[in-house]
């Protein structure tokens, strides 16, 4: 038997893939457009308060006279419960009930009225370990268009689960003009934000979406976020401190705009209204350069 080891064959050069191809992605329909509405996609580390932020921001837009639609993109389907006061059925649940014959559905089967006129939809998601979130988001937008529900909408907010930015749950970026990142002033949150920045920058090569900025949440200070922003080219759009009143609003199944008047909650309401006005006025498209993982370790920390 020969003892000569054969040199392994050179790896095959894989053909380049278009966006949406591959085993973990869904081919996006380039013709599936939302229309004239201002569309924002909200990302951030899991548990950082994206749904709270999205719901309060939706109400702030509605307080400024805008017709708002919030779309929850999470299998937990709890994005809109402070607006609707309940966990509403998901689009996938409703489609399954009619064996995916969408023509049998009415708008009231999957769109639910929320506080101050905000329209609420929970896209839901496939069972754990199966399917792809991109399909769910695509079906949701398709349904909304079929029923002409996007034609009378001024603002759409996609509230996207955790910091998962695979081809599936990055699907809202196909529709958004601006992506917003909710982050706290801590290492784990900023580490996740860096990954999200990288994913959004990759998607921006094929889609209109650009980063709009950071919403600092549940934080007394912003020094670590400020340090990261300066290093990559981001900016902070709003700062919501860690308020007990905001936590209590979730327990009461309501937004901060429905809570009893308290000085700290009034400041939070004004910050949400200011953020909504800023986004409506238009934010500069940002093109940050994400850091390598090891560089974040070197950058962050107390001096």
Swiss-Prot record:
Pathway: Porphyrin-containing compound metabolism; bacteriochlorophyll biosynthesis (light-independent). Mg(2+) binds at residue 51. Its cofactor is [4Fe-4S] cluster. The keyword Oxidoreductase applies. GO terms for biological process: light-independent bacteriochlorophyll biosynthetic process; photosynthesis, dark reaction. It holds the Pfam family Fer4_NifH. ATP binds at residues 47-52, 76, 217-218, 241-243. Keywords: 4Fe-4S, ATP-binding, Bacteriochlorophyll biosynthesis, Chlorophyll biosynthesis, Iron, Iron-sulfur, Magnesium, Metal-binding, Nucleotide-binding, Oxidoreductase, Photosynthesis. Binds 1 [4Fe-4S] cluster per dimer. [4Fe-4S] cluster binds at residues 132, 166. One of its GO terms (molecular function) is ATP binding. Its EC number is 1.3.7.7. It catalyses: chlorophyllide a + oxidized 2[4Fe-4S]-[ferredoxin] + 2 ADP + 2 phosphate = protochlorophyllide a + reduced 2[4Fe-4S]-[ferredoxin] + 2 ATP + 2 H2O. Residues 1-24 are annotated as: Disordered. It comes from the Bacteria. The keyword Ligase does not apply. Homodimer. Protochlorophyllide reductase is composed of three subunits; BchL, BchN and BchB. Component of the dark-operative protochlorophyllide reductase (DPOR) that uses Mg-ATP and reduced ferredoxin to reduce ring D of protochlorophyllide (Pchlide) to form chlorophyllide a (Chlide). This reaction is light-independent. The L component serves as a unique electron donor to the NB-component of the complex, and binds Mg-ATP. Belongs to the NifH/BchL/ChlL family. This is Light-independent protochlorophyllide reductase iron-sulfur ATP-binding protein.
């Amino acid at each position: 038997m020969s003892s000569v080891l054969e040199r392994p064959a050179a790896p095959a050069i894989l053909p380049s893939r278009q966006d949406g191809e591959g085993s973990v992605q869904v081919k996006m329909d380039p013709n599936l457009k939302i229309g004239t509405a201002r569309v924002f996609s909200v990302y951030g580390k899991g548990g950082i308060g994206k749904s709270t932020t999205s719901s309060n921001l939706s109400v702030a837009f509605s307080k400024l006279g805008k017709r708002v639609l919030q779309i929850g993109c999470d299998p937990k389907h709890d994005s809109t419960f402070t607006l609707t006061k309940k966990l509403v059925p998901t689009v996938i649940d409703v489609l399954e009930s009619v064996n995916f014959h969408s023509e049998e559905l009415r708008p009231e089967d999957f769109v639910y009225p929320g506080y101050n006129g905000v329209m609420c939809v929970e896209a839901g998601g496939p069972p754990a370990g199966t399917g792809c979130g991109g399909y769910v988001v695509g079906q949701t937008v398709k349904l909304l268009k079929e029923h002409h529900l996007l034609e009378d909408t001024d603002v759409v907010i996609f509230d996207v689960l955790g910091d998962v930015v695979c081809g599936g749950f990055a699907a809202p970026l196909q529709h958004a003009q601006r992506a917003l990142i909710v982050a706290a002033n801590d290492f784990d949150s900023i580490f996740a934000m860096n990954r999200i920045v990288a994913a959004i920058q990759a998607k921006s090569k094929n889609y209109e979406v650009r980063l709009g900025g950071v919403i600092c949440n549940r934080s007394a200070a912003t020094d670590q976020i400020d340090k990261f922003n300066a290093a990559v080219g981001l900016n902070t759009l709003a700062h919501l401190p860690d308020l007990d009143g905001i936590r209590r609003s979730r327990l009461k199944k309501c937004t901060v705009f429905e809570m009893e008047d308290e000085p700290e909650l009034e400041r939070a309401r004004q910050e949400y209204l200011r953020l909504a006005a800023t986004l409506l006025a238009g934010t500069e498209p940002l093109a940050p350069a994400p850091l390598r993982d090891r560089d974040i370790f070197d950058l962050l920390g107390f001096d």
